[in-house]
Amino acid sequence: MTNVLLVALGGSIGAVFRYLISIFMIQVFGSSFPFGTLVVNVIGSFFMGVIYALGQMSHISPELKALIGVGLLGALTTFSTFSNETLLLLQEGDWLKAILNVVLNLSLCLFMVYLGQQLVFSRI
């Protein structure tokens, strides 16, 4: 039951962060490209790599994994919004932005998970 509450707490924090980051990105770059979703996915991917690496080396408790990995990062990142925004770009006929969105999300997020893991593994 404790882990469920930790996931809920982390999720509420992650959802608020996602909302604030998305609003900020729209204010800075406008809404013609889903930069907010890209940024939260990239940030979340980096920290997921860190959490995974720490977990592999038993330097993080199951409770902290639940709070940060499942709760906070699960709510911060969003595959469903990424998918919806990509589909909307396709429906609007903006194939270039849709393809760019897919390529950037996948390549940057994979790289950031790797970078987060390597940062931890190289320091310990």
Curated annotation (Swiss-Prot):
PANTHER family linked: FLUORIDE EXPORT PROTEIN 1-RELATED
Role, per record: Fluoride-specific ion channel. Important for reducing fluoride concentration in the cell, thus reducing its toxicity.
Chief location category: membrane
Intracellular or extracellular location(s): Cell inner membrane
GO CC, any one term: plasma membrane
Presence of the UniProt keyword Metal-binding in the record: yes
GO process terms (BP): cellular detoxification of fluoride
Positions with a binding annotation for Na(+): 74, 77
GO molecular function: fluoride channel activity; metal ion binding
Keywords: Cell inner membrane, Cell membrane, Ion channel, Ion transport, Membrane, Metal-binding, Sodium, Transmembrane, Transmembrane helix, Transport
Organism per entry: Shewanella sp. (strain W3-18-1)
Keyword Cell membrane: yes
Bilayer disposition of the protein: Multi-pass membrane protein
Protein name: Fluoride-specific ion channel FluC
Disulfide links within the chain: none
Lineage: Bacteria, Pseudomonadati, Pseudomonadota, Gammaproteobacteria, Alteromonadales
Catalysis performed (reactions): fluoride(in) = fluoride(out)
Means of activity regulation: Na(+) is not transported, but it plays an essential structural role and its presence is essential for fluoride channel function.
Family that this chain belongs to: Belongs to the fluoride channel Fluc/FEX (TC 1.A.43) family.
Range of residues in the leader sequence: none
Membrane-traversing stretches: 4-24, 35-55, 60-80, 95-115
